[in-house]
């Protein structure tokens, strides 16, 4: 019954019944006059009632609002247009606009029901959006048609003049410019792009006036003040313009006005003078003017391709300055590996400091530093290592390479071996210096050379038991693994330490077994090292030497003991790697001499005839040593650098071991002694092994040939690995991937790559594509 009464009464309430109550409140809101809470609620209620009960009510409300809004705007228009002066016009407009724009957010709120009725919007389903309100749109469209569209150009010009004046240092109310911007942003009637009018007018005018200003100002400032002062000016103006843009331009997310303005400023202030500014870069780098370089970097980083010339200048400086410093110190560093490494580290730290302070460790500049420093480290100008071009000595040609990896290995040896250097350093200091070596090693192209030399030095330290700190030795192996050294190489080093530990247990067992037995030598005086051939990879060359009887008799005992514990394994004796301590007695005193097996064999020739002179020819018969090894060994006993009185004497005198003849006579120096502080010592110990290599001349040649041979094998393996995965690949891509695989060991030369590709084609591992000779196909 109630429902039918409602339907029956629909239409009984008319728009005219309510508008007289609604209109005074609407006019008060337009004029920014205060309304009571009750009036505010009544307006909501009356709008709702008219929209609900009068079918034509919504349209009538809309029309009535339009008339009142238009009337209000005409009054505002009259107040604005009463000013003829553009600045006065702008100020008057902004006063009226700000009041009106505020009411654009307030007046639409009571008319929500009007929105629902006219537009079909459901307030219950969608959040009310004042910006989409038809009342707000009505207000803004009417303002645009009545006032803004007629005077917008005058307003815009006035706003731009104010911005220009601000650039020249004059102050004004920033709201005058902001109000013009707001008008453009909010008075656009295009629903698809609400910023269209703003972009086409205000933003364009702002950007054009900015560009005109700096196209005039910048060249004259540069001419009057020079490049370095101009950079400060440009930097200050860019920061100033960014702050100004954030005030005067639209900053909503979908608008990129600020970015467009900054691009415009960069073009006018920096890009136009790019070449002039960059011309100063090289000199600044040479003079280490980091603050100025940082300023240049911050400017050029805003310009397309602005950084590239700076990177090139940095690279050229590092290479030229680095090599110049190395050449200047060549006399010292070529003979002193410690000074060499210190020099390289000094250069690295100097260039790193430059990159940090001037370029804030920007990755592009770090890459340029690394590239240039790598060129310095791998330069072969000052000193070089000659490697044979072909394997197994086909031809005598050699290829020069940087001696850096060899010198790094020597320096590591000085730190890891018992030397004056390692003795004066703490464990922490040794570790720090080794880490510095690893830093330089990162830039070495041919790491395989370092590996070879490092392993040779490690072999010597382990065999002679002259490591300064066994814990650091083993840590070094792991550090090499961490810096990306090939796993097979690092694993062999680890196996070497394992062999030494196993040998210690074997020695203990051997001594236990023979503690009550009578051997040629007491078991306690013998230290046996059983080494794995694969890990230690010693030369296949066997150097025969006639051992003293005591040693000859001991060897079968050791072999028998080992076979009992490890059946099926065969021992190969490497006398070249062996050493011992012998006691030397004469009229002066008694001394312990640390000697190689070869030195021992030579000295034992006098054991039964201590005062005789023995010729070179007879010593060769007695020791059965090869000629070259005998000469080298004798020279170490007649011209040992650390001794003032040598162990052996000889006649006639010669300048080098090569000058010994068959008739050169050698004898034991009966006055041999150790001299300390100008006093003869009656007892003492001296190491005669010194830097005498535990390798033969031929073995050293094999080491270098082995490096080349291993490179060839590694190159072949890598090509096969790539071809298996790719199946088909171009020559250029193959070379790129090959370098990537091998870079942690060595940098393969194009000639070597070409030769190995041809070898693999010849042996049917790969073939050329019939349609393209520069493409290779894998043959399973």
From Swiss-Prot:
Keywords: Isopeptide bond, Nucleus, Phosphoprotein, Ubl conjugation, Ubl conjugation pathway. The keyword Phosphoprotein applies. There is a cross-link at residue 724 (Glycyl lysine isopeptide (Lys-Gly) (interchain with G-Cter in NEDD8)). InterPro entries: Cullin, Cullin_CS, Cullin_homology, Cullin_homology_sf, Cullin_N, Cullin_neddylation_domain, Cullin_repeat-like_dom_sf, WH-like_DNA-bd_sf. GO terms for cellular component: Cul5-RING ubiquitin ligase complex; nucleus; site of DNA damage. One of its GO terms (biological process) is reelin-mediated signaling pathway. The modification Phosphoserine is found at residue 34. Neddylated; which enhances the ubiquitination activity of ECS complexes and prevents binding of the inhibitor CAND1. Deneddylated via its interaction with the COP9 signalosome (CSN). The modification Phosphothreonine is found at residue 210. One of its GO terms (molecular function) is ubiquitin protein ligase binding. Pfam families: Cullin, Cullin_Nedd8. It is found in: Nucleus. Signal peptide: none annotated. PROSITE patterns: CULLIN_1, CULLIN_2. Residues 711-772 form the Cullin neddylation domain. It comes from the Eukaryota. Core component of multiple cullin-5-RING E3 ubiquitin-protein ligase complexes (ECS complexes, also named CRL5 complexes), which mediate the ubiquitination and subsequent proteasomal degradation of target proteins. Acts a scaffold protein that contributes to catalysis through positioning of the substrate and the ubiquitin-conjugating enzyme. The functional specificity of the E3 ubiquitin-protein ligase complex depends on the variable SOCS box-containing substrate recognition component. Component of multiple cullin-5-RING E3 ubiquitin-protein ligase complexes (ECS complexes, also named CRL5 complexes) formed of CUL5, Elongin BC (ELOB and ELOC), RNF7/RBX2 and a variable SOCS box domain-containing protein as substrate-specific recognition component. CUL5-containing ECS complexes specifically contain RNF7/RBX2, and not RBX1, as catalytic subunit. Component of the ECS(ASB2) complex with the substrate recognition component ASB2. Component of the ECS(ASB6) complex with the substrate recognition component ASB6. Belongs to the cullin family. This is Cullin-5. It comes from Pongo abelii (Sumatran orangutan). The lineage of its organism: Eukaryota, Metazoa, Chordata, Craniata, Vertebrata. The gene is CUL5.
